[in-house]
């Protein structure tokens, strides 16, 4: 009978390593693609094709979800209305594009920490749109996260004002991304509650709609041709973009697996741990400077996330 706990422990290890390795490498690839300089001398340029990058990511995610449905959910019928998927996909892709675009103005630790604050918009939108009620511990955890972010973002005045505008623009993009993440979360909660939408069907349909919108966008704006020209000049980036998209899709699969077998609490702890070490790796590998007060803010944010994962779920709807 001891084989059951052993197999459960092995499965947890596989899920942990899957999430950790996929998203750790995903973070390194994202920073490599968006923040490095391409070319030499006066012909140096940066990657500025956030729409095209997310388009490739959505295509790979959709293909991966289709494969998962064929393998595990082939007998299940999805009854979710298409307009819900299309509406959700707009906030979903907007959040991803804003997040990737923000990396042109802020460093990766700032982006990761900003994206770690999802509980804030989810809670605010839950209270205002869905009239949800949360326990006091949830509000205290969110306050701790807000205080940590405020410490991280605090910059004492130095005599020069250079770069203030770009940093502010990057932070606005992160704020937009967080707001859209919150709207996506509210939409997904509605679909699960009213249509019992499965995670693989949701992943497939949202990414298909996102691919459709983005495909039209990059063709109409002409970004597609500039993106293809850029990949022709620097073919090595194609390898990084494909790996970036594959690690994203595979990482989502391990997250869903963790939620199914071990619940959202374990998944939250794993993803929170992963984000902290991603920031640490970014500081070491890409020499992103972080002051001591920013480290304090970072620790407070992850402490708030950990406490929220453990104690902030006290408000459950009664089961019938």
UniProtKB/Swiss-Prot annotation:
Pfam families in alphabetical order? UAA
Give the GO cellular component terms, alphabetically. Answer: endoplasmic reticulum membrane; Golgi membrane
Locate the transmembrane regions by residue number.
9-29, 49-69, 81-103, 134-154, 166-186, 202-222, 241-261, 283-303
Alphabetized, the UniProt keywords read:
Endoplasmic reticulum, Membrane, Sugar transport, Transmembrane, Transmembrane helix, Transport
Q: GO molecular function, one example?
A: UDP-glucose transmembrane transporter activity
Which BP terms does GO give this entry? Answer: UDP-galactose transmembrane transport
Q: How does it sit in the membrane?
A: Multi-pass membrane protein
Q: What does this protein do?
A: Probable sugar transporter.
Q: What is this protein called?
A: Solute carrier family 35 member B1
Q: What is the species listed in this Swiss-Prot or TrEMBL entry?
A: Xenopus laevis
């Amino acid at each position: 009978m001891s084989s059951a706990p052993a197999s459960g422990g092995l499965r947890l290890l596989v899920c942990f390593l899957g999430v950790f390795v996929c998203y750790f490498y995903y973070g390194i690839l994202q920073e490599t693609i968006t923040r490095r300089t391409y070319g030499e001398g006066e012909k140096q340029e940066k990657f500025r094709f956030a729409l095209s990058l997310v388009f490739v990511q959505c295509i790979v995610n959709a293909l991966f979800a289709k494969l998962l449905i064929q393998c595990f959910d082939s007998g299940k019928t999805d009854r979710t209305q298409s307009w819900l998927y299309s509406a959700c996909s707009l906030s979903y892709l907007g959040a991803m594009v804003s997040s990737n675009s923000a990396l042109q103005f802020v460093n990766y630790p700032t982006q990761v920490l900003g994206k770690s604050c999802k509980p804030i918009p989810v809670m605010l939108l839950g209270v205002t749109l869905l009239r949800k009620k949360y326990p006091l511990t949830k509000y205290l955890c969110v306050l701790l996260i807000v205080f940590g972010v405020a410490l991280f973002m605090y910059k004492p005045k130095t005599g020069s004002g250079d770069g203030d505008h770009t940093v502010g623009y990057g932070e606005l993009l992160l704020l937009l991304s967080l707001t859209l993440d919150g709207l996506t979360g509210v939409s997904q909660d509605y679909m699960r509650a009213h249509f019992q939408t499965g995670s693989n069907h949701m992943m497939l349909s949202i990414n298909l709609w996102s691919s459709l919108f983005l495909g039209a966008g990059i063709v109409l704006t002409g970004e597609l041709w500039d993106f293809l020209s850029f990949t022709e000049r620097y073919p090595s980036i194609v390898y990084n973009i494909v790996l970036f998209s594959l690690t994203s899709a595979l990482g989502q699969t391990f997250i869903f697996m963790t939620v199914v077998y071990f619940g959202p609490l374990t998944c939250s702890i794993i993803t929170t741990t992963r984000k902290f070490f991603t920031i640490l790796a970014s500081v070491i590998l890409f020499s992103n400077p972080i002051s001591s007060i920013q480290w304090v803010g970072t620790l407070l944010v992850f402490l708030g996330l950990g406490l929220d994962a453990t104690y902030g779920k006290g408000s459950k709807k009664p089961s019938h």
